[in-house]
Design a protein with these regions (language model features):
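Long, positively charged amphipathic alpha-helical accessory segments at protein N-termini or as interdomain linkers
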Residues: 58-63, 67-87, 97-155
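N-terminal lobe of the biotin/lipoate ligase/transferase fold
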Residues: 1-82, 149
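Short, basic and Ser/Thr-rich N-terminal targeting/leader segments
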Residues: 19-21, 91, 100
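General beta-strand structural signal in soluble alpha/beta enzymes
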Residues: 27, 87-91
Length: 155
């Protein structure tokens, strides 16, 4: 979609999916992208990867739900490793390059007596944004690292 307030919020309005189904929402721009707590996620229109996944991971024990955010961070790290060295993880869910944040993950789970009822897994990856204006302390994009823009769809 071109624009959403937040891809996580968009998926919150959907019904649960089957155990083997993942619903993905991708936006070119988020008017109210969120991070952990009260933090916002700054992103210029059409510059970064902004997506969320809705799943019902009943196979993940509630006590191990942190594994979902770790798996997401590892997947982003592996994708970025193909472009540059120095990509590291700040557990449980942030991806850094030389102490600068290039990606963040926001996991929102619903749990009932049987386990994890649903999970919305939001990821923001700074791809082509060259300037950041928020009060985020240390953002960086892949384009800043490489010195040129890259195709978001390839990442």
């Amino acid at each position: 979609m071109q624009e959403a307030d937040s891809t996580n919020t968009f998926l919150k309005g959907m019904k649960n999916c089957d155990d083997d189904t993942i619903v993905v929402a991708v936006a070119d721009y988020q008017t109210a992208g969120r991070g952990q707590g009260a933090h916002t996620w700054e992103s210029e229109p059409g510059k970064n990867l902004l997506f969320s996944m809705l799943m019902t991971p009943t196979w993940v024990p509630v006590r191990q739900q942190f594994l979902l955010s770790e798996a997401g961070a590892l997947a982003v790290k592996e994708a970025l490793d193909t472009y540059t060295d120095g990509i590291t993880l700040k557990w449980p869910n942030d991806v850094y390059w030389n102490d600068k944040k290039i990606s963040g993950t926001l996991i929102e789970t619903s749990i009932d007596s049987k386990g994890i009822k649903r999970c919305i897994f939001g990821i923001g990856v700074n791809i082509n944004q060259m300037e950041f204006h928020s009060d985020a302390p240390n953002p960086v994009s892949l384009a800043q690292i490489l010195g040129h823009e890259v195709d978001r769809d390839e990442v």
